[in-house]
């Protein structure tokens, strides 16, 4: 069977710098975020376990190298798997450095999340990606980066476009919103201009604005707030929306 290797990078366990200055700030931040993290995390983890074959979790590259999954093919992808982590570092695990020597490695729709790499990083990426049997990437800029590294790759579509409509329909879960009856905003970054635009667009169309988020603080950003929908509900809200406004593709 296909398995998804689950690794938790150390920087994902760190608090944001603004809240990491003193023990009191860390305590306040943890208290504020605990409930929403637990609820959203449970929904996400439940969906992952239902839809994916997961390995046991690994927290270090050493654990992966010593006890990683045995497979015929190791695949990287998709999205910004070769981009920087939250702390700015680049994790070589996403270049499959833990795989046994001689293992077949491939990448599907991988992305660098940037258009340039520093000289030291170019050396690391060149060394590791040369071990891949096949590399496919998502963006024009990723093809250009591969060429800078002296590597060849093919451009492919994001895997979200591979399944047919029936597949996505099968994932839908019931929601209390009629098709075409609302505008939907899904927002990642705090941007007052986008908030204002979404509210104005919905008002001009004479439709209510719904806002989906797993972050409680977005309840003050405008629109009817819908907290932490399940993946199936999330898809259904997008499908039924008259218009979707977002800063995330």
Model-based region annotation:
Residues 2-127, 174:
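Aromatic- and Gly/Pro-rich donor/ligand-binding loops
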Residues 71, 132, 241:
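An anion/phosphate-binding loop that grips the pyrophosphate of nucleotide cofactors and donors
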Residues 104-114, 142-145, 187-189, 193-231:
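Catalytic donor nucleotide-activated moiety binding site of glycosyltransferases and closely related
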Residues 126-131, 238:
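A conserved, positively charged/aromatic
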Residues 132-139, 244-245:
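A short beta-strand/loop micro-motif in the catalytic core of glycosyltransferases
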Residues 153-161, 165, 214-247:
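Donor nucleotide-activated moiety binding/catalytic core segment of transferases
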Residues 167-177:
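A short helix/loop element that forms part of the nucleotide-sugar donor recognition site in Leloir-type
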Residues 176-189:
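Conserved donor-binding/catalytic core segment of Leloir-type glycosyltransferases
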